[in-house]
């Protein structure tokens, strides 16, 4: 952990916990986590951990994008799995094209991916193709995928198997 000078700050998120008419407010402008540098990822002793867990928000800008991909390499070198929560937030990215390309790469370099139907659809370039994108990622690399569908439940994909579960109110 290091202090960052200037206008960088800790992010704020406010969520409602209701299924219908869900609202959220996330303030990410100038977030400090976007300032993590690749060289800082080399200072971590990955062998002390069981997994590397990250969210898609850190890929939206530099230098945190390169830093996170460096962390992926270092985790793989230490023999620990990479767990990736897609967490696509369009307002954080310079363009949808860059976001789709970068998040798809992150998915391909991960061992476990968690995302909702909209996020996988976004990565596929078409909402209707989201489940197929999740299936492709699961089958091309022995990945565990959690494909969330809101009040429709979720599908867990692994080793050409699919397990459907409903929500737990």
What does each model-found stretch correspond to?
Residues 82-84, 114:
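Hydrophobic beta-strand scaffold residues
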Residues 29, 57, 87-91, 118-119, ...:
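Active-site beta-loop-alpha junctions enriched in small/polar residues
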Residues 73-77, 126-169:
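Conserved phosphate-binding/catalytic region of the ribokinase-like
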Residues 45-47, 106-107, 139:
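A short, aliphatic-rich alpha-helical micro-motif
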Residues 65-71, 96-104, 126-134:
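Charged helix-capping and loop-helix junction motifs
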Residues 1-54:
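Conserved N-terminal subdomain of the carbohydrate kinase-like
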Residues 97-122, 162:
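Structural recognition of alpha->loop->beta junctions
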């Amino acid at each position: 952990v290091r202090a960052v000078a200037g206008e960088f700050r800790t992010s704020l998120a406010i969520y409602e916990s209701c299924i219908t008419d869900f609202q959220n407010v996330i303030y990410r402008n100038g977030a400090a986590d976007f300032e993590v540098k690749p060289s800082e990822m080399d200072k971590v002793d990955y062998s002390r951990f069981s997994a590397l867990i990250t969210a898609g928000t850190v890929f939206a800008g530099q230098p945190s994008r390169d830093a996170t991909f460096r962390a992926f390499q270092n985790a793989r070198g230490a023999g620990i799995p990479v767990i990736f929560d897609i967490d696509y937030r369009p307002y954080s990215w310079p363009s949808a094209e860059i976001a789709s390309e970068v998040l798809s790469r992150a998915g391909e370099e991960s061992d476990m991916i968690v995302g909702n139907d909209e996020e996988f659809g976004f990565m596929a370039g078409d909402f209707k193709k989201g489940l197929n994108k999740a299936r492709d990622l699961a089958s091309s690399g022995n990945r565990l995928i959690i494909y969330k569908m809101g009040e429709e439940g979720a599908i867990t994909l692994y080793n050409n198997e699919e397990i459907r579960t409903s929500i737990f109110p």
